[in-house]
Amino acid sequence: VDDTSTPVRAILADQGTHHAHLELLDNLHAAGWLAALSRPVPGSALADADQEAAMLLIRAHATGRPLLPETQPDPLETLLETDEARAAARTLLGPLAGNDSTSRTLRTTLRAWLAHHGSWDRTAADLGAHRNSVRYRISRIERDLGIDLSDPEQRMRMWFALSRFPDDTPTHPTQRDISR
């Protein structure tokens, strides 16, 4: 595998423990990979496992850390089916849901800004941008979406949308993806 941002999918015949999987994910993350693992499944359910890993990877991008499926189902996750969550995310993101470079840049900026709890400096450092560029992008997002990101409910709604938006852009330029 090279250093491109091309996602890698792998099937692994594995009976590892939850702790062993966490250690594997942490080691991959330390090497610059962002990974997510599905639950173990029989061969007949590989498509479902791939979808689960892909959704976890979307959430991993939003949080900036690798993810495993929860041992207990998240009650909030059960409220929305995957297709419904994606549709809701697309609606909430409105013009930011586009596939053009401006939309991707604004989503990446918003994701980093929310992950850094609104810190202009940490977001700018993470993105390799000037803090005033981050401020401009966030104000543009607020204007384009008609929201006020000083409102915690709006920040929560944007985090929900970004964590469920099918976007495969790494959160860091050197970060690589791996899902299985």
UniProtKB/Swiss-Prot annotation:
InterPro entries: CdaR-like_regulators, PucR_C-HTH_dom, PucR_C-HTH_sf. It comes from the Bacteria. Belongs to the CdaR family. This is Uncharacterized protein in pkwA 5'region.
